[in-house]
Design a protein with these regions (language model features):
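Ligand-recognition surfaces built from glycine- and aromatic
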Residues: 18-21, 204-230
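Beta-strand-rich interaction surfaces with strong enrichment in secreted/lumenal proteins
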Residues: 94-102, 164-170, 199
Length: 230
């Protein structure tokens, strides 16, 4: 049974993986298929195709993305007010929400990423279990630490959950892969196909998904794909 929705349609009615792609979007513009909530997100050309970029060079603490009210309505409809209040109160880590994925519960989320720059941080991550109050989980890689880490965000407070079993230095300005697999409360995190992170969550996953960054990171994202549990 497929366990998440796309554009209001249960994925049980659709076959195969679902990609959230900006390849056909206009370079230099804000993305449509990912809704920026915090930070500066753009569609840029890279390697002959358009990809998603977070540009942290102008990052400022407490600065949500422009047009937040309209974007919150796209994400949560009539429930958007609480989301806006919490984003404004705790805008610190850049993230963008995948358009149309109503409720991811079980399966895999994968993407390619490329860390390009960053003086304070060099991060890219997969965001999931995003709630209307702004709480979420993220699995991220940080090139400043060479590790994969699971973090939880609750009422704007970031809390460390678990670090990967080993450090994995990754070359900058090259593509790498990240995957998060959820089965019930079991979570697995992979870098370049290698299992580095295993954790049992306190409760099942349910919520929206997206991409994540930190402070002044400049990173590219591509091939964002969801595979529902069968």
């Amino acid at each position: 049974m497929r366990r998440f929705l796309l554009l209001g349609v249960a994925l049980s009615a659709l076959a195969g993986p679902i990609r959230v792609d900006v390849a056909q979007e206009k370079a230099g513009s804000e993305p449509v298929h990912f809704i920026p909530v915090v930070g500066n997100w753009l569609v840029v050309p890279e390697g002959g195709k358009n990809v998603l970029m977070v540009d942290g060079r102008q990052w400022k603490k407490g600065q949500p993305a422009g047009g937040l009210a309209d974007k919150a309505r796209l994400i949560y409809g009539s429930r958007h007010e609480e989301f806006i209040d919490n984003v404004k109160a705790f805008a610190y880590f850049p993230y963008a929400v995948a358009q149309g994925i109503e409720d991811f519960r079980e399966g895999e989320i994968s993407m390619r990423f490329q860390v390009v720059d960053g003086q304070l941080d060099q991060c890219a991550g997969i965001l999931f279990k995003l709630k209307p109050n702004g709480d979420y989980l993220t699995v991220r890689f940080n090139g400043k630490e060479d590790n994969l880490v699971l973090w939880t965000f609750n009422k704007g407070k970031r809390s460390f959950v678990k670090r990967g079993t080993e450090d994995m230095p990754l070359a900058m300005k090259q593509w790498h892969s990240m995957k998060v697999a959820i089965k019930g409360t079991k979570l697995e995190g992979y870098l370049n196909g290698k299992l580095l992170l295993e954790y049992t969550l306190p409760e099942p996953v349910s919520g929206k998904v997206g991409v994540w960054s930190k402070t002044d990171s400049v990173s590219y994202y591509d091939d964002y794909t969801l595979n529902a549990a069968q």
